[in-house]
Amino acid sequence: MVTVDGNRLILLTDGPDRLEAITNLIGTAKTSVRLMYYIFAGDWSGRKVRDALLAAVERGVTVSLLIDDFGSSGNPDNFFASLRAAGATVCRFHPSWGRRYLLRNHQKLLLVDGESADGSVLIGGFNIEDDYFKAADDGGWRDVGLIVAGPAAGRLLPYYDALMAWSLKKGARIRELRALIQRYSETSGALQWQFGGPMRRVSPWALSTTRDLNQGCDVEVIAAYFAPPWSMLKRIARVGTEGRARVITAAKSDNTATILAARFTYNQLMKRGVEIYEYQRTKLHTKLLVFDDEVHIGSSNFDIRSLYLNLEMMLRVDDAEFTSLMRLYFEGELDDSLQITREAWDKRRTFLNRLRWGLSFFLVTAVDYTVTRRLNFGGE
């Protein structure tokens, strides 16, 4: 545990611990529980969380749940019928057809008692589904969760409530969504909540990331889905030339296209001295950026969709002790990763592989991962 600006930060690296934290937080809620997840499955873990929410409602706690309709499309609406009947608010984020159809609410949070100064929030990249709560050695997704206990948690309450109101409103306008993303993103302090979405220009979270990367000389990235725009790749390459840059991507996933898309970027980065690693132990789902003394942690992948389109929530932490903790975590992940050497990579850069990588990069930057997951791109 690290204390930052009066808030306790607790890192959760194991799947079973994250599920236990969720049920414990819901079980100890006194006034309110607010949840927001991209995927809320109807499996054992989903039922366990739903039943904990139902118990909270029955003891007088106000409960609201916002899930992405596309991400949770496999879970029928009647799964939440008991929650609604008990008085909870359950909303599916479902923008209308047209250009808004591509918009996904990719944020993940559990906010408990946000009205009080000692509220808590659990953030990270994981969803409510069995695979996110299994141990890594049992085939679970490798991810991180972070509990923030203290006044910073409550600062998320108005953002959540505004987004819920927008999602429930018929005919809600995109410009209203852009306004609330801008309004509630923070630009000062040791802990800053920053949000991303379909802005006309660059979102607050993407702008903050760009600034920190521009100034960075020691960069560490763990990105399960790594397909950033060329402007970001050039910035990472610059750090590789002038300082030190290390990137861990996935070697295993339920979506081969995302692995191949990341490999499309390797050549340019390695030519500039960036060290590339692929995580071997299990499927990787972590989203972590460390730029010198700043850490960005939350829901956002390091790709074009997350940077410029999806609704995302990240916490920027400017604290030397917490940064040291996350650098130690990064070093531990290197132990379960394989470095991609220049010599080995040159042997794999066949014409067919480069074609697969390029096609995959195009598709994952233009199409939702849930769609590309159904495509078969083969290995390498």
Where are these regions (language model features)?
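Charged, low-complexity intrinsically disordered terminal segments
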Residues: M1-E380
